[in-house]
């Protein structure tokens, strides 16, 4: 039976507002803000729930999946209805580049660990200019390695990072077509199919690239590369190849 009551906890300020005594099998608690797997406030909340024997509610944690301490894993094992929404915005080094500070291999290792402990997994992905030409690589990987996993898409509409402003439209169309061939595309994830369809339909209609926004993207990303000591071409060469369109 789906939960009929939602308790929303986007950040540390609202955790104390959760009425633990009222939590039951119909309740749902969702931790989104920050990184809940390392937040002391979330740890204290779970400990209080455990002390009151209130652990059978639906619990969702949105996480980058990088840091899972032994203490956290032992604590979360007491909550049988837990879903981890893992943020993955690309396959392998594409994800590590866009989500600087993450470690693809570690994240995948942790996803397998969480599944082995009986927790459910979903994937949260943001299509944007970084991954719109290669998103199929992530879809195909998840299809093969985590076939029962739902994906939630939140398309990036920011003009300078937009999934709808890549000048290499043929690469985008090809990637979207490959996404459509996966089982993940037909999963019950929120906006997965409709998100891919919207990107595909946009590019097959010969859109005109907003060059000013593309220039803004490269100016921003070049600053990031200088600060991080990275080079875009080493991670997403087709995006670096799009730079030439800024001088036309």
State the predicted function of each range.
Residues 1-13, 23-40, 52-69, 77-108, ...:
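Core AdoMet radical
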Residues 60, 81-85, 105-246:
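Conserved C-terminal portion of the radical SAM core fold
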Residues 14-16, 42-50, 107-112, 139-143:
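Short, well-ordered amphipathic alpha-helices
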Residues 49-52, 75-76, 114-117, 145:
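Hydrophobic helix-cap positions at the C-terminus of alpha-helices
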